[in-house]
Protein backbone atom coordinates (compact mmCIF):
# COMPACT_ATOMS: atom_id res chain seq x y z
CA UNK A 1 0.00 0.00 0.00
CA UNK A 2 1.29 3.42 -0.89
CA UNK A 3 -0.46 6.45 0.56
CA UNK A 4 0.20 10.05 1.42
CA UNK A 5 -1.74 11.92 4.09
CA UNK A 6 -2.51 15.55 3.59
CA UNK A 7 -0.50 18.41 2.17
CA UNK A 8 0.79 21.23 4.32
CA UNK A 9 3.05 24.25 4.38
CA UNK A 10 4.40 26.54 1.71
CA UNK A 11 5.64 25.20 -1.61
CA UNK A 12 9.37 25.48 -2.22
CA UNK A 13 8.73 27.41 -5.40
CA UNK A 14 7.10 30.13 -3.31
CA UNK A 15 10.20 30.65 -1.23
CA UNK A 16 11.41 33.71 -3.16
CA UNK A 17 8.22 35.68 -2.56
CA UNK A 18 8.18 34.48 1.03
CA UNK A 19 11.66 35.81 1.63
CA UNK A 20 10.67 39.18 0.14
CA UNK A 21 7.67 39.34 2.48
CA UNK A 22 9.77 38.39 5.49
CA UNK A 23 12.48 40.91 4.67
CA UNK A 24 9.84 43.60 4.17
CA UNK A 25 8.23 42.84 7.56
CA UNK A 26 11.62 42.85 9.25
CA UNK A 27 12.56 46.17 7.64
CA UNK A 28 9.26 47.69 8.75
CA UNK A 29 9.75 46.47 12.32
CA UNK A 30 13.26 47.94 12.42
CA UNK A 31 11.98 51.27 11.07
CA UNK A 32 9.31 51.37 13.78
CA UNK A 33 11.84 50.67 16.49
CA UNK A 34 14.16 53.37 15.17
CA UNK A 35 11.32 55.88 14.97
CA UNK A 36 10.25 55.17 18.59
CA UNK A 37 13.80 55.44 19.90
CA UNK A 38 14.63 58.68 18.15
CA UNK A 39 11.56 60.36 19.61
CA UNK A 40 11.66 58.74 23.04
CA UNK A 41 13.47 61.63 24.80
CA UNK A 42 11.46 64.34 23.12
CA UNK A 43 9.53 66.29 25.70
CA UNK A 44 6.06 65.54 24.27
CA UNK A 45 6.51 61.72 23.78
CA UNK A 46 3.60 59.37 22.98
CA UNK A 47 0.52 59.24 25.12
CA UNK A 48 0.08 56.05 27.11
CA UNK A 49 -2.95 55.16 24.99
CA UNK A 50 -0.98 55.44 21.75
CA UNK A 51 1.88 53.46 23.28
CA UNK A 52 -0.60 50.76 24.31
CA UNK A 53 -2.04 50.47 20.79
CA UNK A 54 1.40 50.55 19.22
CA UNK A 55 2.66 47.94 21.66
CA UNK A 56 -0.21 45.63 20.79
CA UNK A 57 0.46 46.12 17.10
CA UNK A 58 4.11 45.32 17.56
CA UNK A 59 3.28 42.17 19.53
CA UNK A 60 0.86 41.02 16.83
CA UNK A 61 3.29 41.97 14.10
CA UNK A 62 6.04 40.24 16.01
CA UNK A 63 4.04 37.02 16.08
CA UNK A 64 3.50 37.15 12.32
CA UNK A 65 7.15 37.99 11.78
CA UNK A 66 8.11 35.08 14.03
CA UNK A 67 5.88 32.66 12.12
CA UNK A 68 7.18 33.85 8.77
CA UNK A 69 10.69 33.92 10.14
CA UNK A 70 10.41 30.31 11.22
CA UNK A 71 9.33 29.37 7.71
CA UNK A 72 12.18 31.50 6.36
CA UNK A 73 14.63 29.59 8.54
CA UNK A 74 13.14 26.33 7.27
CA UNK A 75 13.61 27.43 3.66
CA UNK A 76 17.06 28.76 4.49
CA UNK A 77 18.04 25.42 6.03
CA UNK A 78 17.23 23.66 2.73
CA UNK A 79 18.91 26.18 0.46
CA UNK A 80 22.04 26.88 2.48
CA UNK A 81 22.98 23.36 3.54
CA UNK A 82 24.74 20.62 1.60
CA UNK A 83 21.93 18.22 2.49
CA UNK A 84 18.14 18.19 2.25
CA UNK A 85 16.44 16.55 5.21
CA UNK A 86 12.96 15.21 4.60
CA UNK A 87 11.46 17.12 7.54
CA UNK A 88 12.73 20.41 6.10
CA UNK A 89 10.74 20.00 2.88
CA UNK A 90 7.17 20.79 2.01
CA UNK A 91 5.07 18.35 0.03
CA UNK A 92 5.51 18.65 -3.74
CA UNK A 93 2.60 20.30 -5.53
CA UNK A 94 1.46 18.71 -8.78
CA UNK A 95 -1.10 19.98 -11.25
CA UNK A 96 -4.84 19.56 -10.80
CA UNK A 97 -7.27 17.93 -13.23
CA UNK A 98 -8.17 21.17 -14.97
CA UNK A 99 -4.54 22.12 -15.53
CA UNK A 100 -3.72 18.59 -16.67
CA UNK A 101 -6.45 18.73 -19.32
CA UNK A 102 -4.84 21.88 -20.71
CA UNK A 103 -1.39 20.29 -20.65
CA UNK A 104 -2.68 17.15 -22.36
CA UNK A 105 -3.57 19.16 -25.46
CA UNK A 106 0.01 20.43 -25.66
CA UNK A 107 1.50 16.97 -25.04
CA UNK A 108 -0.53 15.46 -27.86
CA UNK A 109 0.43 18.33 -30.15
CA UNK A 110 4.11 17.42 -29.73
CA UNK A 111 3.23 13.92 -30.95
CA UNK A 112 1.20 15.35 -33.87
CA UNK A 113 -2.05 14.05 -32.33
CA UNK A 114 -1.25 10.67 -33.86
CA UNK A 115 -2.94 7.91 -31.82
CA UNK A 116 0.02 5.66 -32.65
CA UNK A 117 2.14 7.92 -30.45
CA UNK A 118 0.10 7.72 -27.25
CA UNK A 119 -2.47 5.51 -25.55
CA UNK A 120 -5.12 5.73 -22.85
CA UNK A 121 -6.31 2.13 -23.25
CA UNK A 122 -6.82 0.44 -19.88
CA UNK A 123 -4.66 -2.57 -20.72
CA UNK A 124 -1.79 -0.30 -21.72
CA UNK A 125 -2.11 1.82 -18.59
CA UNK A 126 -2.14 -1.35 -16.48
CA UNK A 127 0.92 -2.77 -18.26
CA UNK A 128 2.84 0.45 -17.60
CA UNK A 129 1.97 0.42 -13.88
CA UNK A 130 2.81 -3.07 -12.69
CA UNK A 131 3.84 -6.62 -13.63
CA UNK A 132 2.92 -9.95 -12.09
CA UNK A 133 6.60 -10.61 -11.29
CA UNK A 134 7.07 -7.29 -9.49
CA UNK A 135 7.75 -7.61 -5.77
CA UNK A 136 5.72 -4.46 -4.97
CA UNK A 137 2.39 -3.87 -6.65
CA UNK A 138 0.44 -0.75 -7.54
CA UNK A 139 -2.93 -0.07 -5.96
CA UNK A 140 -6.02 -0.06 -8.17
CA UNK A 141 -6.04 3.75 -8.47
CA UNK A 142 -2.32 4.03 -9.20
CA UNK A 143 -2.42 4.38 -12.96
CA UNK A 144 -1.07 7.02 -15.33
CA UNK A 145 -3.48 9.20 -17.24
CA UNK A 146 -1.72 8.50 -20.53
CA UNK A 147 1.29 6.69 -21.99
CA UNK A 148 3.33 8.80 -24.40
CA UNK A 149 5.62 7.32 -27.07
CA UNK A 150 8.25 9.92 -28.02
CA UNK A 151 9.87 9.37 -31.40
CA UNK A 152 13.27 10.89 -30.68
CA UNK A 153 15.29 12.83 -28.11
CA UNK A 154 13.71 16.11 -29.21
CA UNK A 155 10.23 14.74 -28.49
CA UNK A 156 11.32 13.69 -25.00
CA UNK A 157 12.70 17.18 -24.43
CA UNK A 158 9.53 18.92 -25.60
CA UNK A 159 7.28 16.64 -23.56
CA UNK A 160 9.35 17.22 -20.43
CA UNK A 161 9.26 20.99 -20.92
CA UNK A 162 5.46 20.83 -20.86
CA UNK A 163 5.41 18.51 -17.85
CA UNK A 164 7.84 20.80 -16.05
CA UNK A 165 5.77 23.88 -16.84
CA UNK A 166 2.60 22.32 -15.45
CA UNK A 167 4.23 20.25 -12.65
CA UNK A 168 3.17 16.86 -14.04
CA UNK A 169 4.77 13.71 -12.57
CA UNK A 170 6.60 11.67 -15.23
CA UNK A 171 7.42 7.95 -15.08
CA UNK A 172 10.23 6.93 -17.50
CA UNK A 173 9.68 3.48 -19.03
CA UNK A 174 11.67 1.18 -21.29
CA UNK A 175 11.67 -2.62 -20.86
CA UNK A 176 9.52 -2.73 -17.71
CA UNK A 177 11.48 -5.64 -16.20
CA UNK A 178 12.51 -4.01 -12.90
CA UNK A 179 11.47 -5.73 -9.69
CA UNK A 180 11.31 -3.22 -6.82
CA UNK A 181 8.34 -1.10 -7.90
CA UNK A 182 10.48 1.26 -9.97
CA UNK A 183 7.69 2.42 -12.28
CA UNK A 184 4.74 2.46 -9.88
CA UNK A 185 2.68 5.63 -10.53
CA UNK A 186 2.70 6.86 -6.93
CA UNK A 187 1.08 10.18 -7.92
CA UNK A 188 -2.11 9.23 -9.77
CA UNK A 189 -4.48 11.83 -11.14
CA UNK A 190 -2.01 13.80 -13.24
CA UNK A 191 0.75 11.32 -14.02
CA UNK A 192 2.15 10.44 -17.46
CA UNK A 193 4.44 7.65 -18.63
CA UNK A 194 7.16 8.34 -21.22
CA UNK A 195 7.84 5.00 -22.92
CA UNK A 196 10.90 5.14 -25.17
CA UNK A 197 10.77 1.49 -26.26
CA UNK A 198 8.47 1.92 -29.26
CA UNK A 199 10.59 4.31 -31.34
CA UNK A 200 13.95 4.92 -29.65
CA UNK A 201 15.15 1.37 -30.27
CA UNK A 202 17.84 1.67 -32.92
CA UNK A 203 21.51 0.73 -32.98
CA UNK A 204 23.03 3.90 -34.41
CA UNK A 205 26.71 3.21 -34.98
CA UNK A 206 29.32 0.56 -34.22
CA UNK A 207 32.85 1.85 -33.74
CA UNK A 208 34.53 -1.54 -33.99
CA UNK A 209 38.09 -0.19 -33.90
CA UNK A 210 37.29 1.64 -30.66
CA UNK A 211 35.26 -1.21 -29.16
CA UNK A 212 32.12 0.85 -28.54
CA UNK A 213 28.64 1.16 -29.98
CA UNK A 214 26.12 4.04 -30.01
CA UNK A 215 22.54 2.96 -29.26
CA UNK A 216 19.19 4.47 -28.39
CA UNK A 217 17.76 3.83 -24.93
CA UNK A 218 15.02 1.47 -26.07
CA UNK A 219 17.35 -1.14 -27.59
CA UNK A 220 16.89 -4.56 -25.91
CA UNK A 221 20.21 -5.85 -24.63
CA UNK A 222 19.69 -9.28 -26.24
CA UNK A 223 19.17 -7.61 -29.62
CA UNK A 224 22.35 -5.61 -29.12
CA UNK A 225 24.27 -8.77 -28.25
CA UNK A 226 23.00 -10.57 -31.36
CA UNK A 227 24.19 -7.65 -33.48
CA UNK A 228 27.60 -7.54 -31.78
CA UNK A 229 28.02 -11.31 -32.04
CA UNK A 230 28.26 -11.00 -35.83
CA UNK A 231 31.30 -8.78 -35.26
CA UNK A 232 32.97 -11.04 -32.69
CA UNK A 233 31.98 -8.72 -29.84
CA UNK A 234 29.61 -8.72 -26.89
CA UNK A 235 27.83 -6.39 -24.47
CA UNK A 236 29.41 -7.04 -21.07
CA UNK A 237 26.24 -6.99 -18.94
CA UNK A 238 23.52 -9.62 -19.24
CA UNK A 239 20.53 -8.74 -17.05
CA UNK A 240 17.11 -10.38 -17.16
CA UNK A 241 15.37 -11.05 -20.48
CA UNK A 242 13.59 -8.02 -21.93
CA UNK A 243 15.70 -5.35 -20.24
CA UNK A 244 16.58 -2.36 -22.43
CA UNK A 245 19.63 -0.10 -22.42
CA UNK A 246 17.99 2.92 -20.73
CA UNK A 247 16.69 0.69 -17.94
CA UNK A 248 20.07 -1.04 -17.65
CA UNK A 249 21.63 2.39 -17.09
CA UNK A 250 18.88 3.62 -14.76
CA UNK A 251 19.13 0.53 -12.53
CA UNK A 252 22.90 0.01 -12.84
CA UNK A 253 22.37 -3.56 -14.03
CA UNK A 254 24.98 -6.28 -14.22
CA UNK A 255 24.14 -10.00 -14.56
CA UNK A 256 26.08 -13.22 -14.91
CA UNK A 257 28.97 -11.74 -16.91
CA UNK A 258 29.77 -8.95 -14.44
CA UNK A 259 32.50 -11.04 -12.81
CA UNK A 260 34.56 -10.75 -16.03
CA UNK A 261 33.26 -7.64 -17.79
CA UNK A 262 32.00 -5.42 -14.98
CA UNK A 263 28.62 -3.83 -14.23
CA UNK A 264 26.88 -1.08 -16.17
CA UNK A 265 28.99 1.49 -14.32
CA UNK A 266 32.09 0.11 -16.04
CA UNK A 267 30.47 -0.23 -19.47
CA UNK A 268 29.06 3.21 -20.31
CA UNK A 269 31.17 5.70 -22.28
CA UNK A 270 28.62 8.54 -22.45
CA UNK A 271 24.94 9.25 -21.99
CA UNK A 272 22.52 11.55 -23.79
CA UNK A 273 19.57 12.43 -21.58
CA UNK A 274 16.78 14.91 -21.05
CA UNK A 275 16.65 16.67 -17.70
CA UNK A 276 13.45 17.44 -15.77
CA UNK A 277 13.04 20.82 -17.49
CA UNK A 278 13.67 19.35 -20.95
CA UNK A 279 17.31 20.40 -21.26
CA UNK A 280 19.22 17.92 -23.45
CA UNK A 281 22.60 16.95 -21.99
CA UNK A 282 25.41 14.72 -23.29
CA UNK A 283 27.71 13.71 -20.45
CA UNK A 284 30.94 13.60 -22.49
CA UNK A 285 32.41 12.63 -25.84
CA UNK A 286 33.80 9.18 -26.67
CA UNK A 287 37.14 8.62 -24.92
CA UNK A 288 37.86 5.39 -23.07
CA UNK A 289 38.69 7.52 -20.03
CA UNK A 290 38.45 11.15 -18.98
CA UNK A 291 39.24 13.25 -15.91
CA UNK A 292 37.45 16.33 -17.26
CA UNK A 293 34.78 17.66 -14.93
CA UNK A 294 32.27 15.81 -12.80
CA UNK A 295 31.53 12.14 -13.48
CA UNK A 296 27.97 12.65 -14.71
CA UNK A 297 27.85 9.08 -16.02
CA UNK A 298 28.37 7.85 -12.48
CA UNK A 299 25.62 10.13 -11.19
CA UNK A 300 23.02 9.02 -13.74
CA UNK A 301 23.81 5.28 -13.72
CA UNK A 302 21.68 3.87 -10.93
CA UNK A 303 19.52 6.99 -10.52
CA UNK A 304 16.39 5.04 -11.55
CA UNK A 305 14.93 7.77 -13.75
CA UNK A 306 14.81 10.30 -10.91
CA UNK A 307 17.36 12.73 -12.40
CA UNK A 308 16.88 12.46 -16.16
CA UNK A 309 15.57 10.28 -18.99
CA UNK A 310 18.23 8.43 -20.99
CA UNK A 311 17.57 8.51 -24.74
CA UNK A 312 20.95 7.47 -26.15
CA UNK A 313 24.25 6.05 -24.91
CA UNK A 314 27.64 4.91 -26.10
CA UNK A 315 28.37 1.47 -24.66
CA UNK A 316 31.67 -0.39 -24.41
CA UNK A 317 32.02 -3.63 -26.35
CA UNK A 318 34.18 -6.60 -25.41
CA UNK A 319 35.96 -9.09 -27.65
CA UNK A 320 34.36 -12.51 -27.41
CA UNK A 321 36.53 -15.36 -26.22
CA UNK A 322 37.83 -17.34 -29.18
CA UNK A 323 36.99 -20.52 -27.28
CA UNK A 324 34.53 -20.93 -24.43
CA UNK A 325 33.04 -23.82 -22.52
CA UNK A 326 30.59 -24.25 -19.65
CA UNK A 327 31.21 -26.40 -16.57
CA UNK A 328 28.59 -27.55 -14.05
CA UNK A 329 29.79 -28.59 -10.58
CA UNK A 330 27.41 -29.82 -7.82
CA UNK A 331 28.28 -29.67 -4.08
CA UNK A 332 26.71 -31.20 -0.94
CA UNK A 333 25.82 -27.81 0.62
CA UNK A 334 25.42 -24.15 -0.27
CA UNK A 335 28.26 -23.41 2.12
CA UNK A 336 30.60 -25.73 0.17
CA UNK A 337 29.67 -24.15 -3.15
CA UNK A 338 29.99 -20.58 -1.84
CA UNK A 339 33.33 -21.32 -0.18
CA UNK A 340 34.62 -22.78 -3.45
CA UNK A 341 33.62 -19.63 -5.34
CA UNK A 342 35.44 -17.40 -2.84
CA UNK A 343 38.53 -19.64 -3.05
CA UNK A 344 38.57 -19.39 -6.86
CA UNK A 345 38.37 -15.60 -6.74
CA UNK A 346 41.12 -15.31 -4.15
CA UNK A 347 43.30 -17.65 -6.24
CA UNK A 348 42.99 -15.28 -9.20
CA UNK A 349 41.43 -17.85 -11.54
CA UNK A 350 40.20 -16.03 -14.67
CA UNK A 351 36.61 -17.02 -15.45
CA UNK A 352 34.01 -15.46 -17.73
CA UNK A 353 31.18 -16.16 -15.27
CA UNK A 354 30.51 -18.03 -12.03
CA UNK A 355 26.94 -18.66 -10.86
CA UNK A 356 25.49 -20.53 -7.87
CA UNK A 357 22.07 -22.24 -7.82
CA UNK A 358 20.84 -23.93 -4.64
CA UNK A 359 19.28 -27.40 -4.41
CA UNK A 360 15.72 -26.02 -4.48
CA UNK A 361 16.49 -24.14 -7.68
CA UNK A 362 17.91 -27.24 -9.36
CA UNK A 363 14.83 -29.22 -8.32
CA UNK A 364 12.53 -26.50 -9.68
CA UNK A 365 14.36 -26.51 -13.03
CA UNK A 366 13.89 -30.28 -13.31
CA UNK A 367 10.19 -30.02 -12.44
CA UNK A 368 9.50 -27.09 -14.76
CA UNK A 369 10.76 -28.74 -17.92
CA UNK A 370 12.17 -25.36 -18.93
CA UNK A 371 15.39 -26.89 -20.27
CA UNK A 372 16.01 -29.76 -22.66
CA UNK A 373 17.84 -31.54 -19.83
CA UNK A 374 15.62 -32.72 -16.96
CA UNK A 375 17.95 -34.80 -14.80
CA UNK A 376 20.07 -32.15 -13.13
CA UNK A 377 21.71 -33.16 -9.86
CA UNK A 378 19.43 -31.60 -7.24
CA UNK A 379 22.08 -30.14 -4.97
CA UNK A 380 23.76 -26.70 -4.74
CA UNK A 381 25.61 -26.20 -8.03
CA UNK A 382 28.20 -23.83 -9.47
CA UNK A 383 27.97 -22.95 -13.16
CA UNK A 384 31.15 -21.67 -14.83
CA UNK A 385 31.87 -20.02 -18.16
CA UNK A 386 35.52 -20.61 -19.00
CA UNK A 387 37.00 -18.79 -21.99
CA UNK A 388 40.34 -18.15 -23.63
CA UNK A 389 42.30 -17.70 -26.84
CA UNK A 390 42.98 -21.42 -27.23
CA UNK A 391 41.67 -24.83 -26.19
CA UNK A 392 44.89 -25.36 -24.27
CA UNK A 393 44.25 -22.29 -22.08
CA UNK A 394 40.72 -23.51 -21.35
CA UNK A 395 41.95 -26.97 -20.37
CA UNK A 396 44.50 -25.44 -18.00
CA UNK A 397 41.79 -23.35 -16.31
CA UNK A 398 39.48 -26.37 -16.05
CA UNK A 399 42.22 -28.29 -14.23
CA UNK A 400 42.66 -25.43 -11.75
CA UNK A 401 38.91 -25.22 -11.15
CA UNK A 402 38.67 -28.99 -10.67
CA UNK A 403 41.50 -28.92 -8.15
CA UNK A 404 39.92 -26.19 -6.01
CA UNK A 405 36.41 -27.67 -6.33
CA UNK A 406 37.71 -30.99 -4.98
CA UNK A 407 38.92 -29.16 -1.86
CA UNK A 408 35.31 -28.13 -1.22
CA UNK A 409 33.70 -31.56 -1.62
CA UNK A 410 32.25 -31.31 -5.13
CA UNK A 411 30.36 -34.45 -6.16
CA UNK A 412 30.63 -34.17 -9.95
CA UNK A 413 32.34 -32.11 -12.66
CA UNK A 414 30.58 -31.88 -16.03
CA UNK A 415 31.68 -29.61 -18.88
CA UNK A 416 30.41 -28.97 -22.37
CA UNK A 417 31.98 -30.82 -25.27
CA UNK A 418 30.37 -28.82 -28.08
CA UNK A 419 28.32 -25.67 -28.71
CA UNK A 420 24.96 -27.41 -28.20
CA UNK A 421 25.91 -28.86 -24.82
CA UNK A 422 27.37 -25.50 -23.81
CA UNK A 423 24.03 -23.78 -24.50
CA UNK A 424 22.13 -26.58 -22.78
CA UNK A 425 24.21 -26.40 -19.61
CA UNK A 426 24.03 -22.61 -19.31
CA UNK A 427 20.32 -22.59 -20.12
CA UNK A 428 19.50 -23.77 -16.59
CA UNK A 429 20.92 -20.58 -15.11
CA UNK A 430 19.05 -18.24 -17.44
CA UNK A 431 15.61 -19.78 -16.83
CA UNK A 432 15.87 -19.75 -13.02
CA UNK A 433 13.38 -16.94 -12.31
CA UNK A 434 10.77 -18.06 -14.82
CA UNK A 435 11.04 -21.69 -13.69
CA UNK A 436 10.34 -20.58 -10.12
CA UNK A 437 7.31 -18.53 -11.17
CA UNK A 438 5.88 -21.38 -13.27
CA UNK A 439 6.38 -23.95 -10.51
CA UNK A 440 4.79 -21.67 -7.92
CA UNK A 441 1.74 -21.02 -10.08
CA UNK A 442 1.25 -24.70 -10.80
CA UNK A 443 1.02 -25.21 -7.04
CA UNK A 444 -1.14 -22.13 -6.48
CA UNK A 445 -2.53 -20.09 -9.42
CA UNK A 446 -2.81 -17.03 -7.15
CA UNK A 447 0.75 -17.28 -5.86
CA UNK A 448 2.93 -14.17 -5.65
CA UNK A 449 6.69 -14.03 -6.13
CA UNK A 450 9.10 -11.85 -4.22
CA UNK A 451 12.44 -11.51 -5.98
CA UNK A 452 15.16 -9.57 -4.23
CA UNK A 453 18.94 -9.36 -4.03
CA UNK A 454 21.82 -8.29 -1.80
CA UNK A 455 25.60 -8.20 -2.24
CA UNK A 456 28.40 -8.66 0.29
CA UNK A 457 32.21 -8.70 0.33
CA UNK A 458 33.58 -11.93 -1.14
CA UNK A 459 34.91 -13.13 2.22
CA UNK A 460 31.42 -12.86 3.76
CA UNK A 461 29.53 -14.48 0.87
CA UNK A 462 29.46 -18.07 2.18
CA UNK A 463 28.30 -17.13 5.69
CA UNK A 464 25.55 -14.74 4.57
CA UNK A 465 24.10 -16.97 1.84
CA UNK A 466 24.21 -20.03 4.12
CA UNK A 467 22.35 -18.24 6.96
CA UNK A 468 19.75 -17.00 4.47
CA UNK A 469 19.36 -20.50 3.05
CA UNK A 470 18.72 -21.93 6.54
CA UNK A 471 16.00 -19.36 7.28
CA UNK A 472 14.33 -19.92 3.91
CA UNK A 473 14.28 -23.70 4.41
CA UNK A 474 12.68 -23.25 7.84
CA UNK A 475 9.98 -20.86 6.57
CA UNK A 476 7.73 -23.47 4.98
CA UNK A 477 7.53 -21.41 1.76
CA UNK A 478 8.68 -22.43 -1.71
CA UNK A 479 12.02 -20.63 -1.97
CA UNK A 480 15.26 -20.77 -3.93
CA UNK A 481 18.58 -18.95 -4.15
CA UNK A 482 20.65 -17.89 -7.15
CA UNK A 483 23.99 -16.14 -6.77
CA UNK A 484 26.40 -14.22 -8.95
CA UNK A 485 29.11 -15.87 -6.92
CA UNK A 486 31.89 -14.00 -8.69
CA UNK A 487 30.96 -10.66 -7.12
CA UNK A 488 29.22 -11.65 -3.89
CA UNK A 489 25.71 -10.91 -5.18
CA UNK A 490 22.79 -13.31 -4.66
CA UNK A 491 19.05 -13.38 -5.27
CA UNK A 492 16.20 -14.90 -3.30
CA UNK A 493 13.04 -16.15 -5.01
CA UNK A 494 10.12 -16.51 -2.57
CA UNK A 495 6.71 -17.88 -3.57
CA UNK A 496 3.89 -16.98 -1.17
CA UNK A 497 0.15 -16.40 -0.93
CA UNK A 498 -1.53 -13.39 0.64
CA UNK A 499 -1.61 -14.92 4.13
CA UNK A 500 2.13 -15.67 3.93
CA UNK A 501 3.19 -12.14 2.98
CA UNK A 502 4.50 -11.35 6.46
CA UNK A 503 6.70 -14.45 6.45
CA UNK A 504 8.15 -13.42 3.09
CA UNK A 505 8.76 -9.89 4.40
CA UNK A 506 10.63 -11.28 7.40
CA UNK A 507 12.89 -13.40 5.18
CA UNK A 508 13.75 -10.38 3.04
CA UNK A 509 14.25 -8.10 6.04
CA UNK A 510 16.65 -10.54 7.71
CA UNK A 511 18.48 -11.18 4.46
CA UNK A 512 19.10 -7.46 3.99
CA UNK A 513 20.10 -7.01 7.63
CA UNK A 514 22.70 -9.78 7.32
CA UNK A 515 24.11 -8.16 4.19
CA UNK A 516 24.38 -4.72 5.78
CA UNK A 517 25.88 -6.15 8.96
CA UNK A 518 28.48 -7.87 6.75
CA UNK A 519 29.40 -4.47 5.22
CA UNK A 520 27.40 -5.24 2.11
CA UNK A 521 24.50 -3.58 0.33
CA UNK A 522 20.72 -3.95 0.31
CA UNK A 523 20.81 -4.40 -3.47
CA UNK A 524 23.58 -5.48 -5.81
CA UNK A 525 21.78 -4.90 -9.12
CA UNK A 526 17.98 -4.70 -8.77
CA UNK A 527 18.00 -1.14 -7.45
CA UNK A 528 16.05 0.50 -4.64
CA UNK A 529 12.75 1.56 -6.24
CA UNK A 530 9.95 1.72 -3.69
CA UNK A 531 10.74 -1.54 -1.96
CA UNK A 532 14.14 -0.80 -0.43
CA UNK A 533 14.01 2.88 0.53
CA UNK A 534 14.13 2.18 4.26
CA UNK A 535 16.95 -0.32 3.77
CA UNK A 536 18.97 2.33 1.93
CA UNK A 537 18.67 4.52 5.02
CA UNK A 538 19.97 1.68 7.18
CA UNK A 539 22.83 1.03 4.78
CA UNK A 540 24.24 4.53 4.27
CA UNK A 541 22.57 6.67 6.96
CA UNK A 542 20.26 9.70 7.03
CA UNK A 543 22.85 12.28 6.02
CA UNK A 544 24.06 10.35 2.97
CA UNK A 545 20.48 9.95 1.76
CA UNK A 546 19.98 13.68 2.45
CA UNK A 547 22.88 14.41 0.08
CA UNK A 548 21.13 12.33 -2.59
CA UNK A 549 17.90 14.23 -1.93
CA UNK A 550 19.77 17.53 -2.29
CA UNK A 551 21.05 16.44 -5.71
CA UNK A 552 17.50 15.46 -6.69
CA UNK A 553 16.15 18.89 -5.69
CA UNK A 554 18.97 20.67 -7.52
CA UNK A 555 18.29 18.85 -10.81
CA UNK A 556 14.54 18.32 -10.42
CA UNK A 557 13.25 21.02 -8.02
CA UNK A 558 9.61 20.29 -8.84
CA UNK A 559 10.17 16.61 -8.10
CA UNK A 560 8.39 15.43 -11.27
CA UNK A 561 10.79 12.68 -12.43
CA UNK A 562 9.79 9.24 -11.12
CA UNK A 563 8.72 10.67 -7.76
CA UNK A 564 9.10 8.73 -4.50
CA UNK A 565 11.70 6.28 -5.81
CA UNK A 566 15.05 5.54 -4.06
CA UNK A 567 14.22 7.85 -1.12
CA UNK A 568 11.29 9.89 0.15
CA UNK A 569 10.73 13.37 -1.22
CA UNK A 570 7.54 14.15 0.69
CA UNK A 571 7.30 14.49 4.49
CA UNK A 572 3.72 13.19 4.23
CA UNK A 573 4.90 9.93 2.65
CA UNK A 574 4.31 7.34 5.36
CA UNK A 575 4.85 4.22 3.26
CA UNK A 576 7.46 1.77 4.53
Swiss-Prot record:
The record's EC number reads 1.1.2.4
> What does the note under cofactor report?
Binds 2 FAD.
Question: Which EC class is this protein assigned?
Answer: oxidoreductase
Stretches assigned to the FAD-binding PCMH-type domain: 139-320
**Which cofactors?**
FAD; Zn(2+)
Give the UniProt entry's GO cellular component terms.
mitochondrial matrix
Q: What is its main location?
A: mitochondrion
| Biological processes per GO annotation | lactate catabolic process
Q: Which InterPro entries match?
A: FAD-bd_oxidored_4_C (IPR004113), FAD-bd_PCMH (IPR016166), FAD-bd_PCMH-like_sf (IPR036318), FAD-bd_PCMH_sub2 (IPR016169), FAD-linked_Oxase-like_C (IPR016164), Oxid_FAD_bind_N (IPR006094), Vanillyl_alc_oxidase_C-sub2 (IPR016171)
Q: Note the SUPFAM superfamilies from the entry.
A: FAD-binding/transporter-associated domain-like, FAD-linked oxidases, C-terminal domain
Which reaction is this enzyme known to catalyze?
A: (R)-lactate + 2 Fe(III)-[cytochrome c] = 2 Fe(II)-[cytochrome c] + pyruvate + 2 H(+)
Question: Which keywords does this Swiss-Prot/TrEMBL entry list?
Answer: FAD, Flavoprotein, Mitochondrion, Oxidoreductase, Transit peptide, Zinc
Q: Can you say where in the cell this protein is located?
A: Mitochondrion matrix
Instruction: Give the family this protein belongs to, as stated in its UniProt record.
Output: Belongs to the FAD-binding oxidoreductase/transferase type 4 family.
Q: What is this protein called?
A: D-lactate dehydrogenase [cytochrome], mitochondrial
Amino acid sequence: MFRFVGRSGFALRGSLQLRKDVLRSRTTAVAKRHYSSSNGNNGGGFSSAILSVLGGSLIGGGFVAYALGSQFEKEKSVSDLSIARLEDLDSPEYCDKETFAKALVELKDVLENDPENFTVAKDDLDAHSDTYFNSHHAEANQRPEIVLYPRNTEDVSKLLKICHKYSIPVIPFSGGTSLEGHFLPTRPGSCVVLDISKYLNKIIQLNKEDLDVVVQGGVPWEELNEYLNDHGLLFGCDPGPGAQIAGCIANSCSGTNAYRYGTMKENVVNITMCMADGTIVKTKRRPRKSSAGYNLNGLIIGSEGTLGIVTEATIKCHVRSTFETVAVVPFPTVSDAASCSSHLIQAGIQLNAMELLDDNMMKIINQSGATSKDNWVESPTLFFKIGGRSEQIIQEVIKEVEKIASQHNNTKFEFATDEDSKLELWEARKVALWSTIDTGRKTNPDANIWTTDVAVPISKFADVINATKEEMNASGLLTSLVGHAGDGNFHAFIIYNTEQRKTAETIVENMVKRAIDAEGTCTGEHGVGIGKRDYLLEEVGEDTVAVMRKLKLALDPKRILNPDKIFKIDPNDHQH
